[in-house]
Amino acid sequence: MLIQERKKKEVIMEIRIQAIHFDASDQLQAFIQKKVTKLEQYFDGIIKAEVTLKVVKPETSNNKQAGIRLLVRNGDCFAEKIDNTFEGAVDGCTDALEKQLVKFKEKIRSK
C-alpha cells in the first residue's frame, strides 16, 4: 500500500506499509501514517518511509514486529521493535527514530 502526504513545502513524503502474511486494518494503517508523519517535525528531509509489519512467533505473547526505515537526505535511519501489539511496536520504533533524527540533524548542523 502506498500513502503520500504533502508537506508545507510541497515535498511529498512517501509512506509504504507492508504487512507480511496478513492484511493490516485501515485503523492500523491510519495509526502508522499518523505516527510516521509526526517524525517530520524532527527532520525536514524525510523522503520515504518503509514500514514492515509481521507476526514473529504466534505462540508467544510478544509476537508483533514492526520495522521502520526512513530515507532522508544524505542517509537513512532504521528501527525495529517487537511488542504484543503492532501499535506498541510502531510506538517503540517512532520513539527510537525520533532520537536518531535529532542526532542526525545535529550531526549535519555541526559540519
Q: How should these model regions be labeled?
A:
Residues 2-111:
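N-terminal, polar/charged subdomain of small-to-medium soluble alpha/beta proteins
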